[in-house]
Amino acid sequence: MNYPHPLIAREGWPFLAGAFIVSVLVHISAGFWGALPLWIVTLFVLQFFRDPPRPIPSAPNAILAPADGRIVVVEKTQDPYAGREALKISVFMNVFNVHSNRSSLDGKVEKLEYFPGKFVNADLDKASMENERNAVVIRRASDGQVVTLVQVAGLVARRILCYINVGDMLSRGQRYGFIRFGSRVDVYLPTDARPRVTIGEKVSASATVLADLDVRA
């Protein structure tokens, strides 16, 4: 299954167009060196909003990474959004990571819940419960098991975008949201899920398997 989205995220088109137009105008009036700082800004905008194709593993028990970044949490804890004990795996995104968020599994959106909050460094544990965040509870299509994905805003990222609704059916690797300029995604899994990543490991959205969750009969 191929990733069916453009190479530049749609969220970035207005920013990229604005930066490019201003750079061209300054280039015309002040020359290359005068416009160089603006061209550098344009390149930064281009790299930030990149959204490259990714391979999507097809193993039925695979729970995929919802975002690019670095693993900062692998632990047993409470899932406050689905009201259960869970295995929590958190992915921290810095400003240089791709910031599209993609579904970790095939399933139905059972619950969406937005929480206003603070904007502390998303690399800190307390960001999970104190920062602005958006929780998506998904019931797996194959066996009804629940996985919760939580978009968490960060110190710089202050805009969470989510494009799905309760009742929507998601496919693994499907793009469902975006967080601008540094953030994290928390994944809550059933406690019998087997993590495939460790703290400090770098992961790629859709391409990296976070954990194995056996299909129940």
Swiss-Prot record:
A single cellular component GO annotation: plasma membrane
Kindly list the cofactors needed.
Answer: pyruvate
Q: In which pathway does it act?
A: Phospholipid metabolism; phosphatidylethanolamine biosynthesis; phosphatidylethanolamine from CDP-diacylglycerol: step 2/2
Bilayer topology: Peripheral membrane protein
Q: Which UniProt keywords apply?
A: Cell membrane, Decarboxylase, Lipid biosynthesis, Lipid metabolism, Lyase, Membrane, Phospholipid biosynthesis, Phospholipid metabolism, Pyruvate, Zymogen
What is its subcellular localisation? Cell membrane
Identify residues that carry Pyruvic acid (Ser).
S183
Entry note: cofactor: Binds 1 pyruvoyl group covalently per subunit.
**Tree of life domain:** Bacteria
Look at the named UniProt entry and state the broad enzyme category this protein falls under.
Answer: lyase
Q: State any single GO MF term.
A: phosphatidylserine decarboxylase activity
Residues of the site described as Cleavage (non-hydrolytic) = G182, S183
Q: Which residues form the active site?
A: S183 (schiff-base intermediate with substrate)
Pfam families found in the cross-reference section: PS_Dcarbxylase
Which reactions fall under this protein's catalytic activity? a 1,2-diacyl-sn-glycero-3-phospho-L-serine + H(+) = a 1,2-diacyl-sn-glycero-3-phosphoethanolamine + CO2
Q: Which GO terms describe its biological process?
A: phosphatidylethanolamine biosynthetic process
- Binding partners and assembly: Heterodimer of a large membrane-associated beta subunit and a small pyruvoyl-containing alpha subunit.
Name the family: Belongs to the phosphatidylserine decarboxylase family. PSD-A subfamily.
Briefly state the protein's biological role: Catalyzes the formation of phosphatidylethanolamine (PtdEtn) from phosphatidylserine (PtdSer).
Q: Know the name of this protein?
A: Phosphatidylserine decarboxylase proenzyme
Which source organism does the UniProt entry give? Cupriavidus metallidurans (strain ATCC 43123 / DSM 2839 / NBRC 102507 / CH34)
